[in-house]
Amino acid sequence: MFMNKCYKVIILLCIVHCALCIPAWSQKQLRELVVTAKRPMKDIGVQKTTFDSLALKENIALSMADVLTFGSSVYVKSYGRATLSTIAFRGTSPSHTQVTWNGMRINNPMLGMTDFSTIPAYFIDRASLLHGTSSVNETGGGLGGLVSLGTVADVDSGLNAQYVQGIGSFSTFDEFARLTYGDDRWSVSTRVVYSSSPNDYRYTNHDKKVNIYDDDHNIIGSYHPRERNRSGAFRDFHLLQEVYYNALNGNRFGLNAWYTGSNRELPMLTTDYGDERDFENRQRENTFRGILSWDRSGEKLRFGLRGGYVHTWMAYDYSREITEGNRVNMTRSRSRINTFFGRFDGTYNPSKRWIFTLGLTAHQHFVRSEDKQIILQEGDKDIVGYDKGRIELSASASAKWQATDRIGLSAVIREDMFGDSWAPVIPAFFADALLSRAGNIMLRASVSKNHKFPSLNDMYFLPGGNPDLRSEDGWTYDAGISFDTGSTKPLPFSVGGGLTWFDSHISDWIIWLPTTKGFFSPRNVKDVHSYGLEGRLNVAFEPARGWLVDLNGSYSWTPSVNRGEKMSPADQSVGRQLPYVPRHSASLTGRLSWRSWSFLYKWAYYSERYTMSSNDYTLTGHLPEYFMSNISLEKNLSFRPVDLQLKLAVNNLFNEDYLSVLSRPMPGINFEFFIGITPKFNRKK
């Protein structure tokens, strides 16, 4: 173990040495190193993490799950490459994370969560995290927080195009194309991403052992076999069309249309001894999201209207070959989701010290879920699932007051309705104070109550749904300090960071438990106390003319403990850390750039996670901690007709053998090469 760690350190030092010897390119300008003490009034007391465009546009193969893994300290739970990836803040569950795209909530209404592996980072222009109480400014239900994703209307003037081709390990192919047109009034953008791979990476299967025999058939040893990821192929297609029109009189109109077509096999578990040719385990999805928007900006009054529609068709098919040539369908699950969306936002600035906001959001869901393979003995079809509709309304009002040049106060009142059930009023209070202009030292604090209604599966899924479930609710407290400073002379640099304490008490936590009838059913059983620290540090400096070093790090300590009553004398979950919640998580990104070269190092860490509520420290009861390192080297070339971008990415640099989810192996070291072509339509040759 010691030699292994030394080996990794030596390789890392060699990489850093090589990077210092290789020129690297800089997209960041000196102006980004200048820090001012002014912060927007809309962010009074808000705990927010914002991702820059370099992280989002690093390479076309990245999903938002990858960006969040290496760019923040939230927990990303991944079932493998190109499989379900969910996000959880502050020791909560994925359903406690709300996700919006251009203001429209995109959480799956059946499950209550979002699969971030299906969101290409190249389709996102703005991304930020609102931690804890700060999510109440946007929506209710975010007991952990909110992920805000969006696109922007600004494109370069004239006709512009970009094409990127990626070729990687495991016969992986990634393609991206974008075509834009812009003038004083119109902004038009079309983006396309296509990714495919057999995804048959090799791994060491620690859940199996192969015995070694001598000539007398006595066992003299054993080893863990090397296997390939079986049934893991995928094909993902994404198309994003945007049209914006600026009337130049304060009115702006927009259209966003996003289509996703996904065809993915579900990989076999490491404990499965079957032959992948004997079965099919496949999930398909077709999703369309569309938004029409109108924004009106005046001197003191601004408002916006949005209307949207989401359609999702999902299919899960599982079949096995019982005898040679005789394949039997076991499951043919089909789900259809239709969601209609409407939103109004208004902002009034009567003076420089006051901002008032009013918001109203509506989501109408229609969901049909069934298994077409279930047949009763009489021959009639039996629906396993449900066919339900639910209206979800959320209204909010806020007042933000800049009491003095140093002190800001904010209050938010929110009211939510799901179906015919109204939640108690959700209050939230925020405050911040500028302690020192030197260093821009800011103190922030907030408190809020929040509610999370059960998902449609929780209430109506057959068999097991529980329509009598109560909403989860709790109080969250935040307090933190941050600083930002910098200079342009004599050595240009900027340094920023922050530390936040949070404390959350959530009652009536929903969990699915086994019943005497042979299936699982959800119940309100837990009271959870989640608390801890979140820290961040950003450093950027120019050691010499044209050089830039940029470091960004984050860390979270998140104990999340079950404080409820014992369900039975044998219940050992009380007082224990929740399953699949790491106590420690961290990330680090370092960029070295000079002229047209760029070297990037990314690192992520998760501490051990328990797989059972009793926190049993057994072979299958916990997952070891793991460290992940990725690097990339990029070169930009400029010619008269086109610009070229060349990039080599190395993922899992140290060939870490790890699991994010029990019995779900992850790939070892792998490579991908990208070439980008940008024609110069509008530039002088």
Annotate the PLM regions.
Residues 64-67, 85-88, 100, 114-117, ...:
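N-terminal periplasmic accessory domains that precede
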Residues 158, 181-281:
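Periplasmic-side early beta-strands and strand-to-turn transitions of outer-membrane beta-barrels
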Residues 402-407, 494-505, 524-611, 643:
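Gram-negative outer-membrane beta-barrel transporters
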